[in-house]
C-alpha cells in the first residue's frame, strides 16, 4: 500500500465508506449482500417428449418378434433349461419336452396336493375364464378389488392346471412389501397343506424358504427385478405374476420395462398383471401384443359382490352440522374447521346412527376410522376430539366415550396393534390414521369412515436433490380403497369431507406414478447394470416416462456420489456415465444411495460393521418411540453418549439391544425396549437388514479386513471416524451453524443476554413484569415448568434468579454431586455433555409448548401482603427487595483480585484441566491455612461430636475427616446435599481448604459453631477454582468435547500437589483462567497449558468474551497502577470485588396458597443464548431457512463453544423441502470441533474443488466444490449443488499433499479391475491401504492451523478456470503409477496451491498498522463513527473497548505471530 493510502487510512476526519473489495479482502463488518444476489442459472426444462422416439422403436421391435410366428396355445410346457435340444429334429421337440416334463413333475404330482379346494372368495367364479385367457395370451390383465382372492388363488389355479395337463410349471409372484410376500406364501402353503419352502416358498431380500420342489415362489418386486437384470432372461419361469401393479411403485414400473423388452425374444413365459383398481386399461395398452381377438392384452374383471351395504356421503350432505367454511381446493390442506366438523360427525355416528343401525355381528361398539394426511394432523385431530368431549355443552350427559388411537408408520408395532383390540364397555374406538390403513392394515370392526380425502406423497426435486412430503388430494382410487375399510362384517358409512362434484371431477382417478415424482437414483443405477443403453433410453419405455430433466439430474447426482464417472466410454455425456465399482456395490444394497455409500466408506475407513448398523438404522422405520417428548429426547441423548449424532445414537442403541438379546441379560427384551423407549419390531427388522447387507457385501468380496497389521481405531477415535464417514457419505448435505451477528459480537451477546451468568447451564424466560409481581415467591412454580417429571432432589438443583432491570427470569441448572462414590461434579457432567442436559430439555419443552409457558401468580396486593407476613423481604420504591445475607470476611478471600498478575500456588485437587483448585502462597493465606489445620488436628484439638438427631442444614460448616487420609485428618467442610447410604445419614460436603467434594457420614462430623473454633466458620475458602486458559479438549481425542480419562490422569500426575508460578489471565463467574509455569521465567512453550496441546491431549481454544473482557480490564488496571501510586493504593484497598451476597432460599420451602394464584401469566421461552440456526452451503439452498427435524438430537442446536470464531459443521443424512421452501435436515450429526473442518471435509470428499486465493495469492480464502465445469462450455455441470465455503484456517501445500494422498488411497481401495466387478488388490494390499487411510486422516485432523477470517467468500459460486501448468510433480508421479486409477478416479487429485509469500512491504505495513492500533487504544482518542477496521483480520471494531478485546482473540494473535509483530 502506498504512503498516501496509509495516511488516508488514519485520517479520521474523512468519511468512512464500507465497500466490498474484490478478490477476498473485505471490511469485516460488511455483510456480503452483493455476493448474495447470485442466482442459479436457469436450465431448460426437458419433459417427456424424448420418450416418443424410443417408444416407437420398442413397439416396432416387440411387434416384429410376434409377426412371423403363430402363438402356441400350450406354451406352458417348456424345458429349454433342462436339456439341449439342438440335435433333435424339430418335429420331435415338443414331444420330448412333454416326456421330460412328465419325468420332472410327476414326483411332485405324487408328493403334493395340486387340487384347489373351492372357497367362497369371489374370484372362484372366474377361475375357468382366467385360465383360458392365460393359455391363449402372452399377457393378461386381471382386475379385482382387494380381498377378492386374486393374490392367493390365481397361482394355485395355475398349479392345478399344470397338474391336470401334466406340464412343467415354475411360477413367481411379486409383492410390493416384504411382509406381504412371506405372509401370503405362508397362507398359501397352509391352504395346500404343505410345508413352507416345499411346493410353495418365498424370497425376501436374502431371506428365502425355497427348495428344488418349489414351483410357486412369492418374492418382493426388487428380488425379481435384480434376478432379471442379472440374467437378462425370463425363460426360467412359466408364469410371472405381477401383483399390485396399480400402486405404480418405481421398481414395478421398471420391472414392466424389462419384462416387456425380454418378452419380445422369450415368448414362452406368461405374464399376468393383477390390479385392484378399475382403471386397468393402461396396462393392457402398454403390452401391445397380437392376440386372438385384439392387439391389446386382454382384461378380466373379477366381480366384487359384498354382503353388506356401504353408504357414501359428501360435504353437502352434512349441512345440518353447520358447515360454515369453504374449502380452497386449489390449496390442498386441512382447514381448521374441518377438524371440528369431523369431531361432530364422529359424535353423531356414536349417539344417533347406531341406535337404528346396530351391528349384530360384534358385541361392542364398532369403530370409526379417520383418514388424515400426516402425523401433525393426527395430533391436532386428537386434541380437538379430547377438547370436544371435554366440553360440558357438547357432552353434557357424557354419552360419548371415545378411545382415541393413532395409526401411522412412525408408531411402534405395539401401539399399532392397539387398533385391533376390543374397546372397553361403553367406549368406541376412533382410529386416526394416515394412508397406512388404506391397504396395508385391515381392521374388521370398522363401521364408519371419515375421509379428509388428503394424503402426503413424496415428491423429488431432482434439480436441487431435495425431496418434499407434499400434501395433495388423494385420488378417487385411494378414496375407494379407504371406503373398503368398512362394510366387511356389517353395513358401513363413508363421509368424504369434500363436495361430490369435486370428488368426481376435480380429483384424479389414480395416484401419480412414483416414476415421475420420486427419486430415480436406484433405478438409474439399475439401468446401468442392465447395460442396454443410456439410462434415458431405457426409462423412456416406462408406462409413465420421467422427465428427461429428472433423468439427467439423477445422472449428475450419481456422478457427484461417485457411482458414475463423468464420462461414458471416455466421452463426457450429460445424460450418461460409466458405472464405477462404488456404483456397482451401491446398486446391490437395499439402501438409499447415500446410505449405500456410507457402508462402502465404512469399509474404506475400517469401520464397516458400524457403518452397516448406522445405514440399516437410518433405512428402517425409526427405532426410537414417542419421539416428541422430553423422555424420548433424554433416552436418545443417553444412547448418543455426547456425540450429538443421530447415527451414533442408533448404533449404540442397536449394539446394546443386540448384546442383551444374545447374552440373555436384562430379562425380556420387550420390557427392556419399553423401558428405553425403543421399537422392538423395528430393531428386529434392522437386525435382518444388517444381516442382509453383510451377506450382499460378502458376495461382492467386501468384508471386515482382518490381520495383524490392519487398521484399528480406539473407541474415542472410532466416534470421530464414523462422523467423518457420514460426512463423506452425505456430501453435499452440509450445514453451517450460524449466528445472527459477527462471531465476536455473538460471543459477547451470549453473556450479555443472561447477565454474565454461565451460558452452559442457564436458560431464561421473558415476559415477567417485576414491577407488578414478586418473582422470588414463584421459584417452585417456575422450577415445575421445567422439572415436571423429575425427582425432588433434581428440582433442588435448579436455581431461579430474577433481573429487575429487564422482564427476564433466569433458571440455572446445577450438577448434583455423586454422594456415594465421591465422584466430582464435573465427572458427572463429563459423562454427558459440556452443556447441562437441563438446558437441552428446557429448549425442547419450549418447542413442544409452541414458545409459551403458563405461570399462575397472585395479584400484586395479595403477593405483597403474603411476602411481608412471612418476612421474605420488603416492597420499597416500586420494587421487591428480598432479604439477603452478607458473606463475612470478604477481604480474606483468596480469589485473585484485579491487581494480581502472578501468584505462587499449589494445586490441591484436580478434576480435569478446566476445573482444579489452587491454594495461593502469600503470607496472610499461609498463616490462616496453617492456623486452621493446626487447631483442627493439633495435640490440643478437642472436637465435639454433634448430638444425636441434630438437624443439619445446607451451607452449615463443620469439621470432617478428609477422604483417603489414613490419619483421619480433619478439615473444614461445607454441607451441600443430604442423602441416605444404607439407612445412615450422609452429606455431600465441600472441603473449603482443598477443593475436594465427597460424601461423608454425619457420625464423622464435629462441631465448629459455638466452640472456640467458631471463627473458622467465618473464613472464606482457602482455595480458588481454576481453569487452564486457552485450552480445550482435543476434538480428535475427545470427540464428545469433554476431557478423556487418560488426559485427566495425565494432567493430575503432572500438577497435583505441585507448586507453580500462576499467571492469572481472567476471573469469570468465580473461575480463574490461568497459565501454569514451573518457573517464572519459563516461555509460553514450556507452560503446562502448551504441554497438553503439544502432546495432543488438548487443543488451542479461544477465550470467551467475558474472559477477554476481564483480561483486558485487568491489564489496563495493572498498567495504570504502575503509573499512578494513588490509584494503586485505591485498588489495593478496594474489597468490593470480593464482596458477595446470597439471596435467602428459605422462601423455596413455602407452599403458596392455591386459592391466591388467580392471575395467569404467559411467559415466553425458555431460551438459551447458545441457540443457533443453520444455513445450507449449496447454491440451491443457501438462501432458504433451515430447520432440523423435531425427532433429531440436534433439533435443539446449541453452540457448545461460542468463544471459537471458526465455523462448525453439521451433516444431514437426508434433506427435505417443505411447501414454503424451508429445508428440513434429518438424521443429523454435529461434526467434531476442529478448526476448518467444513473446508477439510469438503476437500477430502468433494468430486472436485476450486481453491480460491486472495488477490496477492498469499493464502486460501475460499472453496468452490462440486462436479466442476462442462469441458465443452466452461459452465458449471451441476450448479444447484455447487458448494461455496469460506476457509477460516490457513491451508498450505502440506495440507493439499496429505489430502491428495488420502484421496488417492481411497480411490485405490475402491478401484476395480477391467470389468470393475471386484477390487484389484489382494487382502494384504487392502489392509496396508486402510492403514494409510487411517494415518493420513489422523494427520490431517490433528494438524494445528492458524485461524483466519474470510467470511466474504461464503457465497461465491463463480468458477474460475485453473491454469493447467500448476500441476505438480507429486501429482504427475501419482498419475504415472496408476494411469487407469487416475483417469477413472472418484476422487481426482488437486493441483498444488503455489502460494506466494507475503511481500516485505505488505508485512511492514501490517506491522505498522498493528502498532498504530495498539497506540490508538492507549491514547483515549474516541474511534470515528462506524468504528475502525483491523486490516490484519478484516474485522471492523465499533469502540476502543471492543478493539482492545479483539487484540486477545486467537484470530488476531495468530496473524500477529504470522507477520512477526511483537507487542
Curated annotation (Swiss-Prot):
GO terms of biological process kind: cell differentiation; meiotic cell cycle; regulatory ncRNA-mediated gene silencing; spermatogenesis
Cellular localization per UniProt: Cytoplasm
Cited function: Probable ATP-binding RNA helicase which plays a central role during gametogenesis by repressing transposable elements and preventing their mobilization, which is essential for the germline integrity. Acts via the piRNA metabolic process, which mediates the repression of transposable elements during meiosis by forming complexes composed of piRNAs and Piwi proteins and govern the methylation and subsequent repression of transposons.
Record CDD domains: SF2_C_RHA (cd18791)
Start and end residues of each Helicase ATP-binding domain: 131-296
Binding-site residues for ATP, renumbered to this chain: 144-151
Chemical reaction(s) catalysed: ATP + H2O = ADP + phosphate + H(+)
Keywords assigned: ATP-binding, Cytoplasm, Developmental protein, Differentiation, Helicase, Hydrolase, Meiosis, Nucleotide-binding, RNA-mediated gene silencing, Spermatogenesis
GO cellular component entries: cytoplasm; nucleus
Domain Tudor: from-to ranges: 951-1016
Domain of life where this protein originates: Eukaryota
PANTHER family per UniProt: ATP-DEPENDENT RNA HELICASE, ATP-DEPENDENT RNA HELICASE TDRD9
Its EC number(s): 3.6.4.13
Helicase C-terminal domain segment(s): 348-531
First-tier enzyme category under EC: hydrolase
Name used for this protein in its record: Probable ATP-dependent RNA helicase spindle-E
